[in-house]
């Protein structure tokens, strides 16, 4: 008897085959290929030969791990078993839940053994060869199947059934097109007519869930709804079983599935990225969604803060430009206009044109070395459009503060505060493009040269010198020409048409230098005058000393003679009183004098110290009150800051929700238009059918006679006698 496939065999071998088959590199737009893990008993023995160039396969205690490791590990291809042996000997851990956990432990162990990204390939191979033995060395293979080859060659050599089975008819094996899902159990083998019936359950198998594509894990969010319809079941002719095989192993091929964009996304990838590029250049009109209503909140925020003019007339601002700047950056080099700093604790400037018209208000927030990524996000919270200077961008790269700053859907980044200066400084835009396309750790590996060149120019003194030269030599009309429309050539046209000489309007830096130069000249004049006066006074002092010296000498001699001839009475009073009045009387007089001195001293001390004591107590009470009040104010300030951060986060969440609702409204409108068009088509078709039916009914009604006897009626001729007597053959009755 011939044996048919059993559903249990299809389920087990299908799962194993999907888990052991690596996903193609172009299956999804993600950067890293998907890791897979499955029991070794369910995978092929030559799985390491099927890995693509950017993946490695490791066999850890019968569990296969396939995925994309760090780039520097790819050079050790062929030493996978050596690395696994080293990991098992050093750590002792034999189970890992994910490929990333296994790679992390492997990299740590290799670092302990002296293998790091900077280690040469020769030294690394010498260290890994210490863990080579007869069990870990790879077996020789005559042929190596390339990645992407068809599995039909292996199917031809893999038999299933037993020696007693022969002439087995071909069956229709199910080919699944859709996400990995398990088969439902069946009581009996399916027949040929039932081979195309969907036999997929809605609950995925744990093995399939573990070996699913990374594209489905990273590109589709966890909150995305599951597919509403079951995947279709295709058919594939399988080869007849070979009598030499002892196992039943049919293959189930799962075609690739590209991830879809999130349903709440504002637009497709091309329009979304062109929109971000337009805002980065300070040109919202370059966005494909400009004026469509899908970015109305971004457009309102931009035109409310940034300088813009229409037909040469500047619009007044209603909000401030929030700009992140380097700790030592000069904001005056960010615009062709002049900046005037306002008085206050915050660093704010008023941007004025050459005609002294205020066109914007700039609030500068400085980056600090002690900041973290969370501090940067707190600074940007609540602002849908934020400016980041080129030097600030380079500073964030150096201090690793770029995660999540350039990739928020509910925020647009402008690389400066002046569209003209932004378009003439493309190095900052290049840095923005790199950080928008890649995370910083990924950019250091896959965009290293682009990042290196952009950072080198932005951090060089030539970057500031170029902006300073442009500010001094650009014509005064360039701003109105560049911001009045969306034409990219308007700026260059304004420069070519300008016949004016370089602007002599002083910049804040030039005015400061002029003031310092004038002050220096005045100080030099004062120093010269003081030096002359000092010399004159020195000569006068020398002359006076020469005149006074003889007189002072004579006075000194006279005082010396007087001191020798006279004695101070105060030093001889007690002996005099003792000799004149007696010792007891002299002692009593001295005691009374000491007592009077103490009374006078105490009285004076009390009169002076009492007001000071009262004043000190009053000041201490006031200081205690002020300290308590200051503590209350600090607590209130902390609460207000917390509420402000919470409100900012809620605003960001609401902005994200608004964006999602706008996208859903747009889709509903499109669906409504589609339904209306379809209904109109159906109505027109029904009206046409009704019209045709009415015409047909009218035509039939007109063909009927209106009066009895108005239509001639001819009877058929009567049959002849010969026709009635014609014999009928019995054989003709069966025709």
Curated annotation (Swiss-Prot):
<feature type="compositionally biased region" description="Polar residues">
    <location>
        <begin position="235"/>
        <end position="247"/>
    </location>
</feature>
<keyword id="KW-0694">RNA-binding</keyword>
<feature type="compositionally biased region" description="Low complexity">
    <location>
        <begin position="218"/>
        <end position="234"/>
    </location>
</feature>
<feature type="compositionally biased region" description="Basic and acidic residues">
    <location>
        <begin position="254"/>
        <end position="274"/>
    </location>
</feature>
<feature type="region of interest" description="Disordered">
    <location>
        <begin position="18"/>
        <end position="50"/>
    </location>
</feature>
<feature type="region of interest" description="Disordered">
    <location>
        <begin position="138"/>
        <end position="170"/>
    </location>
</feature>
<comment type="similarity">
    <text>Belongs to the aquareoviridae NS1 protein family.</text>
</comment>
<protein>
    <recommendedName>
        <fullName>Non-structural protein 1</fullName>
    </recommendedName>
</protein>
<dbReference type="GO" id="GO:0003723">
    <property type="term" value="F:RNA binding"/>
</dbReference>
<feature type="compositionally biased region" description="Low complexity">
    <location>
        <begin position="38"/>
        <end position="47"/>
    </location>
</feature>
<feature type="region of interest" description="Disordered">
    <location>
        <begin position="218"/>
        <end position="290"/>
    </location>
</feature>
<comment type="function">
    <text>Non-structural protein with ssRNA-binding activity. Is probably involved in the formation of viral inclusions, where the assembly of cores and the replication of viral RNA are thought to occur.</text>
</comment>
């Amino acid at each position: 008897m011939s044996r048919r496939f059993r559903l249990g065999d299809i389920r087990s071998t299908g799962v194993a085959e999907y888990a052991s088959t690596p996903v193609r590199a172009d299956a999804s737009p993600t950067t890293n290929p998907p890791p897979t893990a499955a029991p070794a008993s369910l995978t092929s023995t030559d799985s390491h030969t099927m890995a693509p160039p950017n993946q490695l396969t490791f066999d850890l205690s019968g569990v296969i791990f396939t995925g994309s490791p760090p780039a520097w590990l790819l050079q050790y291809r062929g030493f996978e078993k050596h690395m696994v042996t080293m990991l098992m000997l050093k750590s002792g851990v034999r189970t890992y839940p994910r490929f990333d956990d296994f790679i992390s432990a492997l990299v740590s162990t290799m670092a302990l053994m002296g293998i790091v990204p900077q280690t040469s390939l020769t030294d690394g191979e010498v260290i890994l060869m210490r863990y080579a033995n007869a069990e870990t060395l790879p077996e020789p293979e005559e042929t190596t199947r390339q990645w992407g080859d068809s599995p039909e060659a292996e199917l031809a050599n893999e038999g299933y059934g037993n020696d007693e089975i022969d002439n087995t008819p071909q069956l229709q094996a199910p080919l699944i097109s859709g996400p990995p899902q398990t088969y439902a159990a069946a009581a009996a083998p399916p027949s040929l007519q039932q081979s195309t019936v969907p036999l997929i359950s809605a609950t995925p198998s744990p093995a399939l869930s573990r070996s699913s594509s990374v594209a489905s894990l990273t590109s589709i969010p966890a909150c995305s709804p599951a597919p509403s319809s079951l995947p279709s079941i295709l058919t594939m002719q399988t080869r007849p079983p070979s009598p030499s095989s002892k196992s039943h192993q049919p293959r189930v091929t799962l075609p690739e599935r590209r991830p879809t964009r999130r349903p709440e996304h504002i637009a497709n990838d091309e329009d979304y990225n062109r929109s971000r590029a337009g805002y980065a250049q300070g040109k919202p009109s370059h966005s494909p969604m400009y004026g469509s209503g899908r970015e109305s909140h971004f457009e309102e925020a931009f035109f409310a803060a940034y300088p813009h003019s229409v037909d040469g007339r500047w619009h007044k601002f209603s909000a401030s430009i929030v700009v992140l700047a380097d700790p030592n950056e000069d904001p005056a080099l960010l615009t062709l206009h002049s900046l005037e700093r306002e008085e206050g604790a915050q660093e704010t400037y008023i941007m004025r044109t050459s005609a002294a018209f205020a066109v914007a208000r700039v609030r500068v927030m400085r980056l600090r070395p002690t900041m973290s990524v969370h501090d940067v996000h707190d600074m940007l919270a609540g602002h849908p459009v934020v400016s980041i200077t080129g030097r600030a961008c380079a500073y964030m790269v150096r201090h690793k503060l770029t995660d999540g700053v350039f990739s928020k859907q509910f925020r647009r980044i402008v690389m400066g505060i002046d569209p003209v200066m932004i378009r003439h400084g493309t190095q900052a835009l290049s840095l923005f493009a790199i950080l928008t396309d890649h995370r910083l750790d990924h950019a250091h590996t896959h965009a290293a040269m682009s990042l290196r060149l952009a950072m080198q120019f932005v951090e060089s003194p030539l970057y500031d010198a170029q902006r300073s030269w442009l500010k001094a030599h650009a014509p005064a009309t360039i701003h109105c020409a560049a911001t009045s429309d969306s034409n990219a050539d308007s700026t260059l046209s304004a420069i070519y048409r300008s016949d004016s000489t370089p602007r002599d309007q002083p910049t804040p830096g030039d005015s400061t230098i002029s003031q310092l130069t004038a002050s220096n000249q005045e100080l030099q004049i004062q120093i010269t005058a003081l030096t002359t006066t000092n010399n004159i006074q020195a000569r006068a002092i020398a002359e006076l000393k020469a005149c006074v010296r003889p007189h002072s000498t004579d006075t000194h001699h006279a005082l010396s003679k007087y001191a020798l001839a006279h004695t101070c009475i105060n030093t001889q009073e007690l002996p005099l009183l003792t000799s004149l009045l007696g010792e007891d009387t002299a002692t009593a007089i001295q005691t009374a004098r000491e007592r009077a001195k103490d009374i006078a001293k105490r009285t004076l001390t009390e009169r002076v110290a009492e007001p000071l004591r009262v004043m000190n107590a009053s000041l201490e009470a006031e200081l205690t009150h002020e300290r308590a009040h200051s503590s209350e104010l600090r607590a209130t300030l902390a609460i207000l800051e917390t509420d402000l951060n919470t409100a900012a986060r809620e605003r960001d969440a609401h902005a994200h929700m608004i964006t999602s609702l706008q996208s859903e409204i747009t889709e509903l409108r499109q669906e409504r238009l589609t339904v209306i068009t379809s209904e109109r088509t159906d109505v027109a078709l029904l009206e046409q059918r009704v019209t045709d039916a009415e015409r047909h009914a009218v035509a039939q009604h007109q063909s009927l006679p209106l009066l009895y006897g108005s239509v001639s009626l001819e009877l058929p001729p009567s049959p002849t006698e010969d026709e009635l007597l014609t014999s009928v053959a019995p054989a003709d009755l069966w025709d």
